[in-house]
Amino acid sequence: ETIIPTGMFTLRAGDKIYLTASARDLESFFRKLNLFKAKASNVMIVGASRMTYYLVKELQDIQKRVTVIDSDAARCQEMSEKFPGVLVIHGDGADAELLSEERITEMDAFVALTGLDETNIILAMYASQMNSCKVVAKINRSSFADLATAKGMVDSVVSTASVTSESIAMYVRAMQNSFESENIKTLHRLVGGRVE
């Protein structure tokens, strides 16, 4: 059940809450609760997919140290040429020994971006056990989302299908709403699309 609380609402153990606010306000809120985590500086990505290229560019733009692991030698070569400041490792990202050698335990964030949902989920669960870092797994089938986030092993799941459909729906609704009201600047969907 999704509830948008009023002043009479009481939070109970086991309730999940979703917050929307500016980054500054969220940071202040989590600091007051002693739940603030420092921003990730070291990021490990397994899988040199097209999504990896975009993510690495964004991470480099904000001065993050990035390690990318992929089993495809050509992709590794291309990635290292395109991003000279990134540590690119040619190897099996599912190899626990390799992950250990590349200091998975020292990472602030781990992102599984291989082409296989199952591999991404297992890698993310492994990273979660090895480290208390932020863990993200990419999945193509949204039916795996609940499995991936079960028992808190994976922090975030990115579903390519839902991101694409959500982007299209947001654009269409924003266009529709811009004709009806000038007060709406951006429309976002939360809680699996149950709240806008």
Predicted regions and their residues:
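Cytosolic regulatory regions of ion transport systems
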Residues: 1-196
